[in-house]
Amino acid sequence: MSALDTSIRVEVKTEYIEQQSSPEDEKYLFSYTITIINLGEQAAKLETRHWIITDANGNTSEVQGAGVVGETPTIPPNTAYQYTSGTLLDTPLGIMHGTYGMVSESGERFEAIIKPFRLATPGLLH
């Protein structure tokens, strides 16, 4: 792990979108707001994303692609980039984690880790 690997901090807030979910059809929509904070000394560009999404039944799906929400943002030192996206699960509980493929101002490629976070309907967990 290089110093660049730890220069990016990822914070996550999740929300269950009840009005667009259909529990009777086993469809649970969640939004997640991601804040990517550049704690390093160089600007860093987010080029790719890789998500691993697991529902309560153990079913796993992967999402890979360029950028996030149609953007490949460059995050200057000591600033943050925030976006909101969503995912649909077949269960009221799930977990997501993954990585962002980043490139530093000097051209060094590295991965920013997105630690596992929970998606859960209100009242499901205490």
UniProtKB/Swiss-Prot annotation:
Record protein name field: Protein ApaG
Q: Which organism is it from?
A: Shewanella sp. (strain W3-18-1)
Q: What is the lineage of its organism?
A: Bacteria, Pseudomonadati, Pseudomonadota, Gammaproteobacteria, Alteromonadales
Tree of life domain: Bacteria
User: What PROSITE patterns does UniProt report for this protein, alphabetically?
Assistant: APAG (PS51087)
Residue span, ApaG domain: 2-126
Matches recorded under SUPFAM superfamilies = ApaG-like
| InterPro entries per record | ApaG_domain (IPR007474), ApaG_sf (IPR036767), Uncharacterised_ApaG (IPR023065)
Query: One biological process GO term for this chain?
Result: error-free translesion synthesis
